[in-house]
Amino acid sequence: MIENSILAANKEGRKATVFALAHPALYMIEMAAHVGFDAINIDGEHGGFPEEAIDDICRVANGYGMSVTARVPDNAAYQINLYLDRGIQGVTGPHINSGAEAQALADACLFPVDGKRSWGGGRGTEFNDQTILDEKYGGKLGFAKWSNTNMIVVAQIEDKKAWDNLDDILAVPGLSGVTGGPHDFAQSLGHPGEPDHPERVAATLDVETRARAAGKTGGGDISTGIGIAELMLGEARAFVAAHKNDKLG
């Protein structure tokens, strides 16, 4: 395992740059490394990532010094553990609506004594290689502490219920921070299809302000990201517009 590259960038006094994937594409990870991205994020809630693909994504990204974070499909502990066992070093839990749900998220991501993460035998625990665990970390307990230090745990606040229960969510010790979900949040506030509605914008600002006051991160405090859809719909569209009337000869 490598040091969390997002946290490493933060130690340098800067936000990490993150390239987001919605489906497995190893060549994109290599190109992301070539242009200087710090980390990779995969969207397991709306994307499609078989377990074997997550293994490969982490393997390639880590080889270039980039950590991989993920939004998981759901917040069940077994589901989160499948991602962590592949080598994921940051988890965003979608639709966290209560303090109990935030606590369960943190517990699933962090080893005891900070949490209740199950010990596996995959990449995420150095294949349970006792020699490596002893030499690099001073044993399993040392690895567990190292892993917890290098884990980012984020609750996605995208429902009015979560906003109502925000104080309880922010009180969870193992939670690193919160992020938003403008479309679903707007919908829960009665404004479907209006992610930029003033009420949603104000609600998200309130969430992030209170998170920072509680010692957590909010929104894009520690990283800034872009995905292939934004690149294609932005830069690629500009390219087509600039060249679609080019003449032959």
Feature locations, PLM:
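N-terminal amphipathic alpha-helix/helix-capping segment at the start of soluble metabolic enzymes
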Residues: 1-20, 134-149, 206, 212-213
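Conserved N-terminal beta1-alpha1 strand-loop-helix module at the mouth
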Residues: 1-68, 74-75, 174
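Active-site mouth loops of central-metabolism enzymes
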Residues: 10-26, 69-73, 151-164, 224-230
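Conserved, mostly hydrophobic/aromatic
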Residues: 19, 32, 43, 91, ...
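Catalytic cores of alpha/beta
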Residues: 30, 34, 70, 75-89, ...
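Alpha-helix-loop-beta-strand connector modules within alpha/beta enzyme cores
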Residues: 51-85, 107-115, 144-148, 195-219
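Conserved anion-binding
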Residues: 78, 90-173
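C-terminal alpha-helical cap/extension of soluble enzyme domains
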Residues: 117-123, 127-133, 148-151, 157-161, ...
